[in-house]
């Protein structure tokens, strides 16, 4: 099982590198502008004061120009999860799907390893891939936040990035499930993207649109409270939901993959 994990990570080392560079660039550019934004916060608040509650909700529902509001709206609530979700969904759909479509999965199945161990190895490799990129983004965010004196404790930023990682795992595991059941990579990516994007919109607007509160409960974004975490309030309920959703997808993928014929 370990050789499969190492091989999968080696296959994707360049992808991890470029994704890490992209996220580092995003973090540096975003936080480099904070001192300028902070100095003009009063004027900017007047300019943006007319925005509707629904519009504010799409960016985390916080004051854009306070330390927590800026970091949350510009990075933690939307942009970082968005980039990591693109990585995670593409990764989840290809861990099994790419090798199956390329006809190389038979080589893996021919090894003296069960389908269960193969699936576990692929899941662990995918999770490590996302974790490494997230950890790099988290470390750079903490360093940049300290450099621009944003005033948010490093532990709060790390906790928010961890919650972001767990959120992204739900989308990645859904793509993995769909690919493992033989839906194909395109379908796995498409359905997962619609679920993630739809969940973001519905989960964000649920605080201002009453009839969306019920439907929002089935979407991971409803439980993603990054602004509260940055303020120091860490709710384990959200992490439990993310973990249960991810585990459920993996278990269903395991049942499906071990029972079907792989072409």
What would you call each of these model-derived segments?
Residues 1-24:
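Aromatic- and glycine-rich beta-strand/loop motifs that create alpha-glucan
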Residues 12-15, 29-68, 191-263:
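Terminal transmembrane helical anchor/hairpin motif
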Residues 24, 28-32, 69, 120-182, ...:
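Secretory targeting signals
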Residues 71-98, 193:
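Long, hydrophobic alpha-helical segments
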Residues 81-85, 133, 163-167, 245-246:
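Alpha-helical transmembrane segments of multi-pass membrane transport proteins
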Residues 88-92, 140, 173-174, 220, ...:
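Hydrophobic/aromatic residues in alpha-helical transmembrane segments
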Residues 89-109, 123:
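Transmembrane helix boundary and interhelical loop/hinge segments in multi-pass membrane proteins
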